[in-house]
Curated annotation (Swiss-Prot):
Key words of the record: Cytoplasmic vesicle, Golgi apparatus, Membrane, Protein transport, Repeat, Transport
Impact upon substituting K873Q: Decrease in the interaction with rhgA
UniProt protein name: AP-1 complex subunit gamma
Function, in words: Subunit of clathrin-associated adaptor protein complex 1 that plays a role in protein sorting in the trans-Golgi network (TGN) and endosomes. The AP complexes mediate the recruitment of clathrin to membranes and the recognition of sorting signals within the cytosolic tails of transmembrane cargo molecules. Also involved in early steps of phagocytosis and macropinocytosis.
Pfam family, one: Adaptin_N
Gene Ontology CC entries for this record: AP-1 adaptor complex; clathrin coat of trans-Golgi network vesicle; cytosol
Sequence ranges assigned to domain GAE in this UniProt record: 775-893
Subunit structure: Adaptor protein complex 1 (AP-1) is a heterotetramer composed of two large adaptins (gamma-type subunit and beta-type subunit), a medium adaptin (mu-type subunit) and a small adaptin (sigma-type subunit). Interacts with rhgA.
Gene from which this protein is expressed: ap1g1
Annotated compartments: Golgi apparatus, trans-Golgi network; Cytoplasmic vesicle, Clathrin-coated vesicle membrane
An annotated Gene Ontology molecular function: clathrin adaptor activity
Family according to the record: Belongs to the adaptor complexes large subunit family.
Amino acid composition bias (Low complexity), ranges on this chain: 604-626, 639-658, 675-687, 706-731, 746-765
BP GO terms, sorted: Golgi to endosome transport; Golgi to vacuole transport; intracellular protein transport
Amino acid sequence: MSSKLRDLIKTVRSCKTAAEERSQIAKESALIRTAMKEEDLESRQRNVAKLLYIHMLGYPTQFGQMECLKLIVSPSYADKRIGYLGLMLLLDEKQEVLLLATNCIRGDIMNSNQFIVGVSLCAFGNICSTAMARDISPEIEKVISHSNPYIRKKAALCAIRVLRKVPDLTENYIPKIKALLSERNHAVILTALTLIIEICEMDSTQIIHFKKMVPQLVRILKSLTSSGYLPEHDIGGVTDPFLQVKILRLLRILGQNDPEASDAMNDILAQVSTNTDSTKNVGNAILYECVQTIMTIESENGLKVMAINILGRFLLNRDNNIRYVALNTLSRVVNTDIQAVQRHRNTIVECLKDPDVSIRCRALDLIYSLVTESNIRVLVRELLNFLLIADAQFKSELVAKLCIVTEKYAPNKRWQIDTILRVMSIAGNFIPDEVPSNLIQLISSTPELSSYAVQKLYLALKQDITQQPLTQVGLWCIGEYGDLLVADKSQLPKDEDGLSLNVSEQAVIDIIDLIFRHATTTQATRQYSLTSLAKLSSRFSQSSLQRIKTMIDNYKQNINLELQQRACEYSTLFDFDKKASILDRMPPIEKQEESPHIGNKNIPTQTPPQQHYQQQQQQPQQQSSQFGSILDGLDSPTQSSANSGNNNNNNNKQGGNAMSLLEDIFGSAPTPTSNGNMNNNNNMNNMNNNMNNNYAMGGMGMNNNNNNSMGGMMNNNNNNNNNNNNNNNNNKSQASALLDIMGDLQLTPTPQQPQSQSQQALSPTNQTSVLQPVPQPLTFLVYQKHGLNISYECSKPQPNNLSLTNINMVITNTGSSPITNFSLQAAVPKYLKIQLLAPSSTVIPPNNSGEVTQVSKVLNSQQGQKPILLRLKLDFQINGQPFSDVPDTPLPSLF
């Protein structure tokens, strides 16, 4: 005979170790199984109760499911109560055993004993499946009109479960619901309101059936607010706050986008807002729901101001939860009436000093929404003060928002530059990458403030050179506007003593030298320093030139390849007759607009591009399109190599194109004038060959076929021409040096100059080529399997170079589980060249809650003749299970 439940609990509690507990549970489970086999009716109820306790401890109890079914068919209420409780805990709606309980539940719902009806409805509402909902729905419709309110309220809650499983049955319950609102029992009204809200949220077309109930709901709410003390419903001095909150929530749904229904609610909402006690938490709950209703429906302006004032009072509350919901609600309604929210600006700013990190975060978001042209100076000053004491987790986001509002609402460019410099000096290395580039673009596009900006940056560098983003911007500006720094004194800022600062060339070089030698200086900052020195060599006097050369020469043997390459190229550039034009001041930098698809969570699926576009008339192709794509940074060759005969022909043609490009830039190709120059050019040629080889070895997926890259083109071309004549060799050596120095500089081609017969024979322009009109950017779905969706956002970044295509791969996950260890690789045919960047993440969140992007650039050497075809290699895991696929993803013919 098994022990009692009380004895089992005492035994388990007295166990000293987990092993001892498992042993006791195993013994008791064995005794329970034995009793089940013997069909011991007296101990069945007690055994199921002990199984429930064992289940709560986390041990398996599946063997007791049939015992629960045997208990619910018993005529005894005590047996049914334990049986239904075991049914709810040991089974769920997916268990096939549950189908055996359908007839028993149907019979118990129609029982004359209200307690048996109650436990059966309770079990049905918790474990009802779709099939069971269809079978027992007629009984629920009957008991929802029962005379006993105890049964009616449970039936209304069961109706919610039925409609969630079978929404088609909604029409059957709407007539029954209207009668429930006429009840005097608050529990019945509360469950009826819950059922109405559920129907409206599931199907918005059903709202029209309940709009006629607005006057009735208003009367119920008015009676609750004006009634006296009711002990059975009073909570904290408020009459039935749960029912009031539920009515306000339903009024919010019925009054949305309905002026007539909203007008009927205005008076009662004003009454609730003014009469509810806000000193207790229960009153604040009603006020919060009332504010949400006022801001959602078509309420009067005065009522909205009252609601915002209530939220302002919430900000003064000592409870962090109330302050948080106030800030959260104000962030949502700030666009409705920003002037009313502005009245509480000081209180919102004070929330930045709150010790609770979540409140500080919400206050920061709200202040960002409150910034306008009239208060930009005040709020930015407060945000800068907060930036001084902000935690590291806030700084990056705060800096980004500060720069956005500064750019959007700045009263003038000078104030904008001062503010961003202040932000960068405070935030240090927490500056996002786009902030320095945006500041450089701002200074470059504002010539009248160039002198002022470079002087401010010089002063900032004198104070602190450990902030790398600020140091890099300062070095860029000093390199571009160093002559203004040492010459123009009219706008020079004052120091702390109010005296004008005199900046000499040696002082500028000293601070760059200090940056070189400082321990915190990164390699990227040293690269900026080398470029800045090279720029200053054409802006400073001859007395400073020797020191600049010495500082650059010190890095010609540096172990860092990038620093060594820059130093060698700049050192060679000093002897070049075109140095002044190459190192001249850059033209104003145009601000690049972000792609409209960036940050979109849902990528629209369009029809296949081949059906979307019509065939267009072809036009002659420009000769220099290939060079524009090469200079744009695409250096990686494809995974295949051509034969040696084709390599020689391609090298000759590319050499002719390189000379044509130089003629377009400088008017004519440079020619040697002495043997000394020839020797220097030969040295330069050897240096560039070494650099090109090093660069090729460091690329991703590089092979021996470099005829598609600028480095390989100049290398092979020079080697071929060394055996022919010195003149062409010198010209092409200088061309290679120029292209190495210019790096990613984008060049605009000019009309082609007349060529000699030999040049025309080597030039590809003697072949017939065509140019298609520029296709518009296009987004389309290319892969959809295992919940993984991949969309391509294709665009042509250069209208005069259709051979270059940018493909932004947007990867989303429609499944319910996250995709981990995601890897995407791409292979292309021989006539294509691809540069594939790393993905933004290797984890793709589920349910379309986020996206991963991976950018690729494709260069088509046979544009207009062969399409772009990418074969992807996908590897990922879902719940630890690996998946792999190799799909082909063609692009439209016009791309």
